Design a protein with these regions (language model features):
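Helix-loop-helix junctions within the multi-pass membrane cores of secondary transporters/permeases
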Residues: 276, 280-358, 416, 426
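Transmembrane helix boundary and interhelical junction motifs in multipass membrane proteins
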Residues: 56, 213-216, 286-294, 324-329, ...
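Hydrophobic transmembrane alpha-helical segments of multi-pass transport and channel proteins
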Residues: 51, 86-90, 94, 244, ...
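Signature of multi-pass transmembrane helix bundles
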Residues: 3-10, 14, 21-25, 33, ...
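Transmembrane alpha-helical segments and their short flanking loops
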Residues: 328-426
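Membrane-interfacial loop-to-helix junctions in multi-pass transporters
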Residues: 52-53, 157-161, 207, 246, ...
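Small-residue-enriched core segments of transmembrane alpha-helices in multipass membrane transport
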Residues: 81-92, 237-254, 273-278, 348-361, ...
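Short amphipathic alpha-helical coupling elements at transmembrane boundaries
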Residues: 39-50, 144, 152, 190-207, ...
Length: 426
């Protein structure tokens, strides 16, 4: 295999998984037992996960604020586009909730979570399920939206408060951009540039950190296999297939029907026109990197340029249905694995956290895995549970990430198609 092929992220992840499995099996073998502790490797892998978690909220803050300042949306088209995004993400959340509550893939994992909790130094699952926390206090939740100081949302990992603060900053800077005072205008331009610069800096740091993902995956896979054996992949197959099923329903059933109902296009014609962009998104694992191909396909589908740019370029922060569906299903899967009886309001809180987090992580490689610790923390999972959960999903996230990207690309194209049809219809 050539050096260029080995340097490809997919190849590196596959090699990391193979090496992780090998080390895990070696630690379980008679000649390897006691030679090293796979749990130590797992802790090394979690260092990167914690670092990604620390980067996620500042990135979300700058991404949301910068998007509000920089995105040029006409009022009517902007409201229409946001309505399309809201419907799409609600459908994605509904699909996730329906599949998880119907098929219950997490029930067979209850014993495995217990073992992994012991491996990370925690006593039992029961110690991490606090009955008093399972009851939602809406007044307390509302008060959490208003921090005591500006840095508190990022310090405490509060997604909703972070996004609200970012939105207020972005709206304020945007509203001041029309000032006629030259000195004020320079100050506003400086603030806008600072928001863009902050987003670019944290994005670059995150891209550097993502390059270490194969090392973290190797460590986490060796930890999981060393403790649970190869049976972990057999048991994970249910979770993998159900997430792929959810993404398939969203991408291949709902989107074509929505294109027919809202965009006046035949379902097969929509999928045929979008196929090149979707496969490109799957291959490169990024809806943002696929933008040129997506715009080309939309042009060939006779979607007007303004609608295409609003949905594909301006709406990057809002078209993340694949990520939202993945986050909701993963959090509920882990809840089932822990034996937690989550009622509908609690599940909706998880869905809301996923939607908010996904809005600020657009274009970031492995975005789903990056924001997963934040979503789990905001959904009431303890640090120990998060440390035990990440090794479960990381071995198969590389394939799910590509499926998520493909769905996100198709969601971008659906938004442009419907928006273009509405513009032509008046």
């Amino acid at each position: 295999m050539s050096t260029s092929k080995l340097s490809h992220p997919t190849a590196q992840v596959l090699i990391a998984i193979i090496l992780g499995i090998s080390l895990g099996l070696y630690s379980r073998s008679p000649w390897g037992a006691g030679s090293f502790d796979p749990g130590t490797l797992g802790q090394v892998g979690m260092l990167l996960i914690r670092f990604l978690k620390a980067l996620a909220l500042p990135l979300i803050f700058f991404a949301v604020a910068d998007a509000i300042v920089r995105t040029n949306l006409a009022e009517k088209s902007g409201l229409r586009f946001l309505l399309i995004c809201l419907v799409n993400v609600s459908i994605a959340s509904g699909i996730a909730l329906t599949l998880i509550n119907t098929l219950h893939p997490g029930t067979k994992w209850q014993g495995h979570i217990e073992e992994l909790l012991k491996l990370v130094g925690s006593s039992s699952v029961a110690a991490h399920i606090a009955p008093e926390k399972t009851k939602l206090d809406w007044l307390q939740g509302l008060s959490g939206m208003f921090p005591q100081h500006l840095l508190e949302p990022i310090q405490t990992g509060n997604i909703l408060a972070t996004v609200i603060l970012a939105a207020l900053v972005g709206i304020s800077v945007r509203s001041l951009s029309s000032t006629t005072d030259e000195q004020e205008r320079r100050a506003v331009d400086l603030l806008a540039s600072a928001l863009t610069g902050g987003f670019l800096v944290f994005s670059r740091i995150l891209h550097f950190a993502i390059r270490l993902a194969p090392v973290a995956i190797l460590a986490l896979v060796s930890q999981a296999v060393g403790k649970l054996g190869l049976g972990i992949f057999v048991d994970l197959s249910d979770y993998l297939l159900i997430v792929i099923l959810g993404l398939t329903i969203q991408g291949l059933i709902y989107y074509p029907l929505a294109a027919f109902i809202g965009g006046g296009r035949s379902p097969l014609g929509f999928l045929r026109g979008a196929s090149q962009a979707v496969w490109t998104g799957f291959a490169v694992n990024s809806s943002l990197a696929t933008v040129p191909v997506t715009l080309k396909c939309l042009k060939e589908m006779n979607v007007d340029e303004q609608s295409a740019r609003i949905s594909v370029c301006g709406g990057t922060n809002f078209n993340n249905d694949g990520v939202v569906l993945y986050e909701v299903m993963t959090a509920l899967f882990l809840g089932q694995a822990m034996g937690m009886a989550l009622d509908l309001p609690q599940q909706l809180v998880i869905a809301g956290s996923s939607i908010i987090a996904a809005a600020g992580i657009a274009g970031v490689p492995e975005a789903g895995l990056v924001i997963l610790p934040i979503v789990l923390a905001n959904s009431g999972f303890s640090e120990a549970v998060i440390a035990a959960a990440i090794p479960l999903v990381s071995p198969i996230d590389w394939i799910l990430a590509r499926c998520r990207s493909a769905v996100n690309v198709l969601g971008d194209m659906l938004g442009a198609t419907i928006l273009s049809h509405w513009r032509r219809s008046g």
